[in-house]
């Protein structure tokens, strides 16, 4: 009886330890963001998912996000609850990865939990796109779970297909996570002595899982669009017809993007945003070099046959392509930090490959490689903990500064003769120009998606303005779109804020000119 219950107890302890590690790393890195309400950019526009946000999600193919919100939380973006849910999904993903590769040591759990929790994808999502954070991390869990099911047995790809459908419906880019994990599993099995034929058939089942999941997802998406009456986005950066550009591209363009897919994969991993770039770039380069040498050492060993050696090298060469697949299928036009979670799985390689080397037969100085590599991974994780906190602080400072400016703007609006709050239509022209483009010391942190401006709205459309007045200022202003009126000579003649006369009622509408349109 003890032999039956002991594995279950070991798995339970590993799960709880893994969750504890994720939440400790998560609180260090992201508690600032989860305990503040610095909504901006898309998270401001989609603060309340009941309506616009849910329509946006369906229109770009992420039709399961509204369902996810309905099940686990309200349609509103609740920072702390969203953060806790996101960390829970990351913790379960980390546990499945540990089991997938039979990593049982506490050190492995600490490191895997660390780089899955503290990375630029998680930080950029939580800083600017918090409304999507829990859904995106659930997409991660579904992508990892699909690979876990596929690896469990011959027919595991069938439940894996269901999980891939769920992952696609939450955020399509997490297919790259599945691809990289599948490649890693196949490589490790070949190094363990599995025959090429068996691994190829297993790989074909993985391809069937991904392809079948994609086809069923697409059919369901079309059904949801038809039933909801919501039109799919087309020919914009995050629309699902982006990959069709690949079919229209010339051979020269495809070759260029193919090369860029590999180049950017390594560039973005090595040159990832960091408070001490030289240190983290050196650490990443060292980890990649050690992993490469360890892989070649394993390939050259006598226990691996020649067909297996060749297949290992082919699969290893596919890892950068699979990890950066979004860049290739969108022809380099739509990939950003939120779409590259698969990059950070590269830190698994030293944890998988180094323990396989015959350390008892190697020289003593070489035996220090394992703890040194573990230390380098900790350095990279700690760097991302700092990056996350800087991003959240930047958003917080910008929110305070923007509130100060807009408080004064509202005073001007209310002082305009004939303006009745909540009744007079209001058109905001442009964006405030009183904020510095950068905060001193934060210049390098403008690079991630959604962090490039100090402007909270980022876009000056009526939707963002209406959200700011409703949710931040709690002001009853009746924000409308200006349309062609913004090119009216009377509007163009208005001076920009803070000049006197920057507000005026024209044809019954209050125009507030903040900058030239």
Which residues does each predicted region cover?
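Cytosolic-side transmembrane helix boundary signature
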Residues: 188, 192, 341-375
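Membrane-interface transmembrane helices that cradle and orient dolichyl/undecaprenyl
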Residues: 143-157, 189-196
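Membrane-interface micro-motifs in multi-pass membrane enzymes
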Residues: 58, 62, 86, 107-151, ...
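Transmembrane alpha-helix segments characteristic
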Residues: 114-117, 303-329, 379-380
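Perimembrane helix-loop-helix junctions
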Residues: 178-211
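Intrinsically disordered, polar/acidic, low-complexity terminal segments
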Residues: 2-55, 59, 69-92, 99-115, ...
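Membrane-interface alpha helices of multi-pass inner-membrane proteins
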Residues: 156-172, 177-178, 183
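Hydrophobic, aromatic-rich transmembrane alpha-helices
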Residues: 267-309
């Amino acid at each position: 009886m003890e032999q039956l219950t002991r594995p279950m107890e070991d798995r339970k302890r590993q799960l709880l330890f893994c969750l504890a590690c994720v939440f400790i790393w998560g609180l260090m890195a992201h508690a600032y963001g989860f305990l503040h309400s610095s909504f901006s950019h898309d998270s401001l526009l989609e603060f309340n998912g009941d309506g616009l946000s849910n329509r946006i999600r369906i229109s770009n193919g992420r039709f399961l996000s509204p369902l996810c919100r309905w099940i686990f939380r309200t349609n509103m973006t609740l920072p702390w609850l969203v953060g806790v849910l996101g960390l829970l999904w990351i913790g379960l993903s980390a546990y499945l990865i540990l089991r997938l590769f039979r990593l049982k040591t506490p050190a492995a759990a600490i490191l895997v939990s660390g780089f899955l929790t503290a990375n630029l994808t998680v930080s950029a999502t939580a800083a600017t796109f918090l409304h999507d954070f829990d859904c995106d991390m659930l997409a991660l869990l579904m992508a990892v779970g699909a690979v876990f099911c596929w690896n469990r047995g011959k027919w595991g790809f069938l439940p894996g297909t269901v999980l891939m459908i769920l992952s696609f419906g939450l955020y399509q880019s997490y297919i790259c996570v599945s691809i990289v994990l599948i490649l890693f599993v196949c490589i490790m099995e070949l190094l363990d002595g599995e025959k090429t034929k068996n691994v190829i058939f297993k790989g074909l089942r993985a391809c069937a899982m991904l392809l079948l999941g994609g086809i069923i997802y697409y059919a369901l998406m079309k059904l949801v669009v038809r039933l909801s009456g919501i039109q799919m986005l087309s020919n914009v950066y995050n629309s699902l017809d982006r990959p069709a550009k690949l079919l229209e591209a010339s051979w020269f363009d495809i070759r260029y993007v193919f090369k860029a897919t590999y180049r950017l994969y390594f560039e973005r991993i090595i040159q990832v945003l960091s408070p001490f770039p030289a240190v983290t770039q050196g650490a990443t380069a060292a980890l990649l070099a050690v992993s490469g040498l360890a892989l070649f050492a394993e390939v050259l060993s006598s226990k691996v046959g020649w067909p297996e050696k060749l297949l290992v090298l082919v699969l290893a060469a596919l890892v950068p392509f699979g990890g950066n697949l979004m860049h290739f299928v969108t022809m380099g036009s739509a990939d950003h930090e939120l779409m590259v979670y698969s990059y950070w799985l590269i830190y698994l390689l030293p944890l998988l490959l180094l323990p396989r080397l015959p350390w008892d037969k190697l020289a003593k100085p070489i035996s220090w490689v394992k703890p040194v590599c573990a230390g380098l991974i900790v350095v990279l994780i700690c760097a991302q903990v700092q990056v996350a906190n800087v991003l959240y602080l930047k958003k917080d400072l910008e929110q305070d500064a923007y509130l100060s400016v807009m408080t004064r703007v509202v005073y001007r609006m209310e002082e305009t003769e004939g303006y009745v709050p909540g009744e007079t239509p209001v058109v905001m022209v442009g964006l405030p120009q009183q904020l510095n483009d950068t905060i001193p010391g934060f210049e390098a942190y403008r690079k991630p998606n959604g962090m490039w401006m100090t402007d909270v709205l980022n876009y000056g459309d009526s939707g963002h303005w209406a959200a700011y007045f409703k949710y931040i200022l709690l002001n009853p202003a009746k924000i409308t779109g200006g349309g062609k009126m913004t090119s009216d000579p009377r509007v163009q003649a208005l001076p920009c804020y803070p000049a006197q006369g920057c507000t005026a009622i024209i044809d019954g509408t209050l125009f507030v000119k903040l900058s030239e349109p």
